[in-house]
Amino acid sequence: MIRTDAKDGALVLFSGGQDSATCVAWALERYQTVETLGFDYGQRHRVELECREGVRDALKRRFPQWSHKLGDDHMIDLSVLGAISDTAMTRAIEIETASNGLPNTFVPGRNLLFMTIGAAIAYRRGLRALVGGMCETDFSGYPDCRDDTMKALQVALNLGMDTRFVLETPLMWLDKADTWRLAEQLGGKPLVELIRVETHTCYVGERSELHDWGFGCGECPACKLRKRGFEAYLRGESVTQAPV
């Protein structure tokens, strides 16, 4: 029998970065209960995990319309993923394109594991929606960020758990400039500023210098994309129109 008792709630995969923080705000606008889920998998930029509580606290303090909706936070030790991965996200190696054409920041199976574990927690918590910041538009080559992957995973999870989860990916067709715009639509300039200062994107974990677009080394692919997106957002352009 298909489970139908899930409440109007969402579990958001929340790393502490720009995209997932925007997804938390997006869910808070749409659901009565929002819980968050983070993973420690041995990532080089582990500082992002330290940003999570600051973002959650700031959302509660600065956005009273959301404070009563933001529920429990869950943190999962997924160090086994780092142990079996040989990538620039989990090793101090140079970021480059691998022989298969994928960036060596790709962690095989990461989003599949994240969503599957998220579904198990959501099932226990009685939450209907799983929300993730996967995106095809700012395409880095990650196959587990594709819309087709998420749709297939939704089918598999619902069959395997005999329920009716909805996998929400609000950023799927947005570029980084659009993601900044979405933050402004959700919470105005205060939310944009919260995300700019409190979230973390840099792959190498640099958090000593605050740029116009946020903290970071300014040189890794994640920093460059965040910078281009923020500058395009300020100009009212898309990332594809922005100079490289």
UniProtKB/Swiss-Prot annotation:
Pathway: Purine metabolism; 7-cyano-7-deazaguanine biosynthesis. It comes from the Bacteria. Binds 1 zinc ion per subunit. One of its GO terms (molecular function) is ATP binding. Pfam families: QueC (PF06508). Its EC number is 6.3.4.20. It is an enzyme of class 6 (ligase). The keyword Manganese does not apply. Signal peptide: none annotated. ATP binds at residues 14-24. Zn(2+) binds at residues 202, 217, 220, 223. Its cofactor is Zn(2+). Keywords: ATP-binding, Ligase, Metal-binding, Nucleotide-binding, Queuosine biosynthesis, Zinc. GO terms for biological process: queuosine biosynthetic process. It catalyses: 7-carboxy-7-deazaguanine + NH4(+) + ATP = 7-cyano-7-deazaguanine + ADP + phosphate + H2O + H(+). Gene3D superfamilies: HUPs (3.40.50.620). CDD domains: QueC-like. Catalyzes the ATP-dependent conversion of 7-carboxy-7-deazaguanine (CDG) to 7-cyano-7-deazaguanine (preQ(0)). Belongs to the QueC family. This is 7-cyano-7-deazaguanine synthase. It comes from Burkholderia thailandensis (strain ATCC 700388 / DSM 13276 / CCUG 48851 / CIP 106301 / E264). The gene is queC.
